[in-house]
Amino acid sequence: MIKVFLKTSIMLGITLGLSLYLSKAFSPVSSNLKTAYLSVPEDTLDLVVLGSSHTQYGINPAVIHNETGLYSYINASACQPIRVSYQMLKESLKTQNPNLIILDVFTMLPDQSVCYDESIYKLASDEMTGMEKINTLMMLDDKKKAFDYILSIRMYHQLWNELDIESLKISNEDLPYDSFGFINLQPKEYLFKYMEGPDKKYRYDLNQSDLDNLLKIKALCDENNIELLLVKTPFDMNQKNYDALMAVWDFAKENDIDYLDLNQYLEEMDFAFGVDSETWHNTNWGAYKNSEIISEYLLKNYKFNHVDNEDVNRNLSYLKKSTLFGLLLNQVDPYNFFKYASKFDGIIIIKYNGYYKTSIESAENALLNEMGFEYDFINNRNTNYYGVSVNGKLKGYDNKEFKTIINGNEIIVNKNEIIIDGKVLKDTDGELTVVVYDSDFYWHQNMNIDYGSKWFWKNDCDGWVCK
């Protein structure tokens, strides 16, 4: 009898394991394991961010690396409940041993009900493996659907005739992770709507299940000697959500959990709803500001055992290029244009036609210097300056015409034009023109300054067009 039981158990185990394995092969790509997290070299991440899509749009690992030198990954999912964040934490620790976990608390607030849908469990499970995937799918009310997702061979068995031997190779090695979980959202309207958080007015009772799972997350972090930081990125909060957020922070204090409320930094960040954020999701402009504040907080409050990794650096380089492109695209504020250009690697071309009426003062001079053009533009404002910098280092300049070759591309800059490989660049007729290229010369963005206009013309804009 015992032998029969053992044989039956072994056969059931083999059948279940084989079914789970083949389920991945039978699933179409859109339903298969989506996470690129497993492709990140093991034990290289310094911090992992968990939570809802607010962090996917609101925190940029490229900016954090620029400001701190640390590696981070946004292992979040749409409207991720706290109990799912616990499963995601367990999943994250399978391949990484970070010093810090950052947890978004949006789904502890009442507005989470707006985005709640059973599909959120399926979305989160796509970023998980093993028991964490199963545990998350079993949170579905429809258990039949949960089992179909777990054993998706049941749902997609009709695809058997489309499979080949390559379909059975279940691997994450080739999944690119160069977004690091960040979603690059462009501003859609050039609007500046400044907000202040309301004062706490009413007592709000948080969901007990959320509190229990938050304590489980803290316990798991403590068990692995990992620090835990709760965050809330900026979003348009009503009174009820604000009271709930204050209740979360009160609970955090009571349980010795660190937190950072970015909604308290709106004025310091000059954070504007419209250009920096939609109602809930922050744009790449807003994510930059959030990530700067987070970086400053990390350096002041935590210690990290960072080790450089060539593969991670290579993938971060791609994210930095796409980040810079997004920050400069449609950018009409020269101060931000120059600041962002100075923060990332790239090729910067300057065409400055000297004139005694230029409005260059110390702030503007500093920005030009930070882009690699070490020159006194204040005391030499009458003198022409045509130059090129590469990754923040001056390649060279001249006051009549400057020529150079970078990565096989010829650059000529003079009073009238900027020429790249024999072609005159369009839209470079400003009295001061700055052009930013990525290192591959794949894209470029221009900024023209007319000395007769203000350097900062935010209030003189109609949509994206400025006078």
Residue ranges and their predicted role:
Residues 3-24:
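Hydrophobic membrane-insertion alpha-helices, especially the h-region
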Residues 25-44:
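Alpha-helical transmembrane signal-anchor/signal-peptide segments
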Residues 47-51, 282:
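Short hydrophobic beta-strand that contains or immediately precedes a catalytic carboxylate
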Residues 50, 54-139:
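Membrane-embedded segments
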Residues 100-110, 171-268:
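Conserved, well-ordered alpha-helix/loop/beta-strand core segments that scaffold catalytic motifs
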Residues 118-224, 306-325:
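Secreted/periplasmic serine-hydrolase-like ester/acetyl group-modifying domain
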Residues 242-313:
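C-terminal regions of proteins
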Residues 325-467:
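Short acidic-hydrophobic catalytic motif
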